[in-house]
């Protein structure tokens, strides 16, 4: 019998579980984390930032109904024109974190989505994580679709993302 998997908002009681899931299922397979060395360790400032984003109430998860464990998730955050995702001074970051965030910031040099769209807020789909044993089942696609639906429902004018991980199209 096929399991019914539902997308649901990330409950505060699951924040720590989701952080552990990210470090277990996302970073060890994510090219930027592997190249920078971030996959091998966690930085408390980065974890604190993830928790701040989770408290915004826009992250989503899929849980296995049999085990009640997270098997996929979308770490999302709300953006404001006046806010920066991290301090401009990267000196407070570990080298691995600094390397990734400076690279991602560099991708947006010369382009300001807020000015382009003439808006003051938006959303970022920061990470899509799927348990390795559940890849190729469309869970990342479902999380993306639900993130878009949530943004529309909330009147958020745009969603941005910097994908760096290939999507698995079929579970071989």
Language-model features, listed with the residues they occupy:
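Conserved GNAT-fold acetyl-CoA-binding loop/helix
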Residues: 28-47
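Conserved GNAT acetyl-CoA-binding A-motif
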Residues: 121-123, 151-164
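A short helix-loop-beta-strand connector motif used in the catalytic cores of GNAT acetyltransferases and
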Residues: 47-61, 72, 79, 84-85
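Conserved acetyl-CoA-binding loop-helix of GNAT-fold acetyltransferases
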Residues: 124-130, 135-151
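Conserved acyl-donor/pantetheine-binding loop and adjacent beta-alpha core of acyl/acetyltransferases
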Residues: 67-127
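Conserved active-site alpha-helix within GNAT-family acetyltransferase domains
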Residues: 141, 152-154, 164-172
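Conserved beta-strand-loop-alpha-helix junction that forms the acyl-donor binding cleft
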Residues: 126-132, 160-171
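A short beta-loop-alpha structural element at the N-terminal edge
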Residues: 5-20
């Amino acid at each position: 019998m096929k399991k019914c998997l539902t997308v649901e908002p990330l409950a505060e009681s699951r924040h720590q579980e989701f952080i552990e899931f990210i470090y277990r299922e996302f970073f060890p397979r994510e090219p930027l984390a592997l190249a920078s060395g971030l996959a091998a360790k966690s930085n408390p400032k980065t974890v604190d930032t993830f928790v701040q984003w989770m408290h915004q109430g826009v992250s989503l998860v899929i849980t296995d109904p049999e085990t009640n464990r997270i098997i996929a998730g979308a770490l999302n955050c709300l953006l404001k024109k006046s806010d920066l995702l991290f301090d401009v001074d990267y000196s407070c970051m570990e080298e691995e974190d600094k390397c990734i965030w400076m690279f991602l910031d560099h991708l947006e040099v010369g382009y300001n989505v807020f000015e382009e769209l003439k808006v003051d807020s938006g959303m970022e789909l920061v990470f899509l994580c799927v348990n390795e044993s559940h890849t190729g089942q469309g869970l990342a696609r479902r999380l993306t679709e639900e993130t878009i639906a949530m943004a529309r429902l909330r009147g958020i004018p745009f969603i941005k993302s910097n994908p760096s991980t290939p999507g698995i199209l079929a579970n071989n």
